């Protein structure tokens, strides 16, 4: 049951109608991309795995990283919401890729619809739609974002030296950084 990893599995005990979904379901937005680095996680395969779980109509769902759930309708609804969150990220990322947007632009625009974003099973903790969108982009198109300047970018040192010249020297740079910091622009500072 591919999902968080390609070798992921789930365990179904039919006589108890109990399903152990492994790491393919937990009470947080799914880890569709891990910032520590892993091979590409296939969102379509993860969706199919959750669909297989839904098809079984379990009465008990015993995830590895959250409390057990019970009740066929309750479990079906939770699995459906989780599945729909993954599908939404995949489909909207591909749609925006087809419009010519790069990974950073897609990550900025991709927000779950309210009915998905409000689900406690899709709260951002270990993964986010933005990080996941970049994973989908990279999985389908690789690292090139479509901007020719990123094919052979300036070295960081040369870019920094040019930036210092652009703002009028070190003194101006420090003044801009300090003002930004004082205004709450910590990332820019």
Describe the function of each predicted region.
Residues 1-99:
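Metallo-beta-lactamase
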Residues 55-60, 68-188:
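Accessory terminal helices/loops
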């Amino acid at each position: 049951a591919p999902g968080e990893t390609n070798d992921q599995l789930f365990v179904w005990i039919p006589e108890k109608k109990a399903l152990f979904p492994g790491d393919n379901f937990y009470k947080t937005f799914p880890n569709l991309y891990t910032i520590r680095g892993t091979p590409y996680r296939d969102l379509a395969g993860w969706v199919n795995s959750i669909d297989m779980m839904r098809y079984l109509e379990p009465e008990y769902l015993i995830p590895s990283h959250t409390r057990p759930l019970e009740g066929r309708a309750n479990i079906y609804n939770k699995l459906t919401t989780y599945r729909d969150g993954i599908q939404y990220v995949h489909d909207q990322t591909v749609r925006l890729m087809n419009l010519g947007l790069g990974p950073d632009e897609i990550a900025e625009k991709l927000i779950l619809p309210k009915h998905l974003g409000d689900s406690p099973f899709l709260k951002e903790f270990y993964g986010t739609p933005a990080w996941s969108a970049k994973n989908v982009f990279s999985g389908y198109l690789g690292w090139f974002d479509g901007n020719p300047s990123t094919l052979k970018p300036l070295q960081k040192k040369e870019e920094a030296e040019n930036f210092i010249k652009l703002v009028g020297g070190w003194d101006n740079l420090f003044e801009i950084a300090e003002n930004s910091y004082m205004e709450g622009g910590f990332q820019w500072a």
